[in-house]
């Protein structure tokens, strides 16, 4: 009897193991399907506004405001982009001098449209200067705090981190007083100075964690070979810190390119205004050209997208390396 039971249980064991494997495989595929569906839903929410921005940039005003909206333009046009690049010409039609046509035709542009390209140049200059100065200040500071032991080192690191706890809007008045005393109101250098105060703490924090994760033997070996502190930093540590450097470069560039509040406070004329300020000025108390604003917005996101695509493979690794010690 016992022998028969053992034979029966042995005969059922392979079937049970097959069922378990099938269940595990089904659960694995269901898990993947849920992750895929969630990823597609998030991607749809994130990319839908961008897709509409691109599509509406090639539509006229009447098609943009039509119901239901046209995700694919019926009659694609480049008129909006031509108006941007011809905004300073004799054919400019402004809110004040627009033709006696139906405003829905989109045959008018804002009176401040001629400031768009200079504002893009100002934004690029400010972002580039902030990135360069950010690296010149942040790299030596992070290296010193990570590899040189001195009194007050930990307190300095915590102080740098606490500066990012303060919201930017609380710093507007102190920044304004400093910029006014320096005589830099309505000058792009005012934005460079304030953006450095915002981005340098992040740069120092990320690079400190990365430099601390590198073994001290690298520094000692470089010193034995006759390298100074500066040579050890530039020849040994910086090449290894490239992912984190790219991450802080992107953060500084995108922050400077997109910042609105401080630029609104410190710039008044087209000579110093950046792109977000000029884009905000395209609205009027009486009417608005969605087609023109969308085309200008599409041009505004091109440089950051190009920078992000070029350095995309460094972004995640750089932020991860700076977020985890060791």
What residue spans do the PLM features occupy?
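Short, Lys/Arg-rich, polar N-terminal cytosolic tail immediately upstream
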Residues: 1-26
């Amino acid at each position: 009897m016992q022998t028969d039971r053992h034979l029966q249980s042995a005969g059922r064991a392979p079937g049970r193991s097959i069922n378990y494997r099938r269940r595990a495989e089904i659960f694995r595929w269901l898990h993947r399907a849920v992750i895929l569906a969630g990823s597609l839903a998030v991607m749809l929410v994130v990319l839908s506004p961008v897709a509409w921005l691109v599509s509406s940039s090639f539509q006229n005003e009447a098609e943009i405001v039509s119901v239901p909206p046209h995700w694919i333009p019926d009659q694609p046009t480049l008129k909006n982009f031509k108006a941007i690049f011809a905004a300073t010409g004799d054919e400019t039609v402004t809110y004040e001098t627009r033709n006696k046509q139906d405003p829905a035709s989109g045959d008018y542009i804002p009176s401040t449209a001629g400031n768009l390209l200079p504002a893009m140049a100002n934004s690029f200059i400010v972002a580039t200067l902030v990135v360069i100065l950010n690296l010149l200040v942040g790299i030596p500071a992070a290296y010193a705090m990570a590899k040189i032991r001195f009194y007050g080192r930990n307190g300095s690191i915590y102080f740098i981190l606490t500066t990012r706890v303060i919201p930017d809007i609380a710093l507007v008045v102190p920044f304004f007083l400093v910029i006014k005393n320096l005589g830099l109101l309505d000058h792009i250098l005012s934005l460079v100075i304030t953006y450095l105060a915002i981005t340098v703490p992040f740069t120092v924090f990320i690079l400190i964690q990365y430099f601390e994760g590198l073994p001290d033997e690298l520094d000692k070996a470089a010193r034995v070979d006759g390298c100074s502190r500066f040579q050890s930093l530039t020849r040994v540590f910086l090449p290894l810190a490239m992912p984190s450097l790219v991450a802080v470069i992107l953060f500084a560039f995108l922050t400077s390119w997109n910042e609105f509040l401080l630029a609104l406070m410190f710039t008044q004329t087209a000579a110093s205004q950046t792109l977000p300020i000029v884009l905000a000025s395209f609205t009027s108390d009486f009417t608005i050209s969605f087609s023109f604003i969308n085309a200008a917005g599409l041009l505004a996101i091109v440089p950051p997208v190009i920078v992000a695509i070029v350095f995309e493979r460094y972004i995640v690794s750089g932020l991860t390396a700076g977020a985890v010690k060791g």
